Amino acid sequence: MDIIFAPSPNYRPRPADLPWQQVIQHLVIHYTEMNLTDSLNRLRSREADVSCHYVIDEEGAIYQLVADRHAAHHAGKSFWRGVSGLNATSIGIELVNRGHANLDKDGQLPPYPGEQLASLIRLCHHLILQYPIGALNVVGHSDIAPTRKIDPGEHFPWLLLAEAGIGLWPPLPDEAAATAGEATTMAGDSDAAPAIAASPKAGVPAVPLTAAQAADFAAGVQALRSIGYDVGGYDRGGDPTAGELDADAIAPVILAFQRRWLPHHLNGQFDPPTLLRAQQIAELYS
């Protein structure tokens, strides 16, 4: 595997309580929202103080900016499955993709080219063989920082990665597929992820909720917690049937879940297809 070295000064040592090879337990995928030149410039700028371990351009070239043994500055404030501050425990991969800030004239997100995805799969296979990165810990930036980040986006082909043995993608339950319109093309059904429209703004139910809504909401929060999302503070510990749940605050977390697991159904709500999918994924992650 050919790798182009383009060192960044933005890194720090990993925790020293274990050999660094054992500390690496997460793989975090991002998009740059910039072209290659601007991406490399920013990720190597001392003033910006951000970085990642690898950048993959649209033609599939792989650049290494930070050595695996060091912690790159890519995750920021983050949480996944009980672990906070994932810079210390992760490898960060940035894909050159213009993302949500650069939609085409039809409002479509730019697809991930097949050459880029092929290189990503090769790199992920290499990293998973080298370090104890389990399938449950292959995540997107939006999974670990849902209130701040939306990359790699709903157009990222998680299915394609899962078919290559990287991460997980269980088939959609029939009810969720029918309700969400997922029976059509899924992102990742081909070598290159297809274009997909940008997500709408979240619409969340007003509180207080009805007893039935509150029960579904509480079940959804518990499912997201079981999967690994940070739902701390969103469940106020009260009686769910009394509507003591913060629907507005958790909408970004629901959207992050939908971007990952229900990418053609983005509304920030625990509606029936979302709740069904969340409970299915939670069972897989338990």
What is each residue range found by the language model?
Residues H100-N102, P146-I150:
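Short, well-ordered, mixed-charge alpha-helical segments that flank or form enzyme active sites
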Residues M1-L136:
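Active-site-adjacent loop/helix surface patches within enzyme catalytic domains
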Residues P110-P111, I144, V207-P208:
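Short, contiguous strand/loop micro-motifs
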Residues L117-P132, R148-S286:
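Cell-envelope/ECM-targeting effectors and their regulatory/trafficking segments
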Residues I133-R148:
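Acidic/histidine-rich, metal-coordinating catalytic segments
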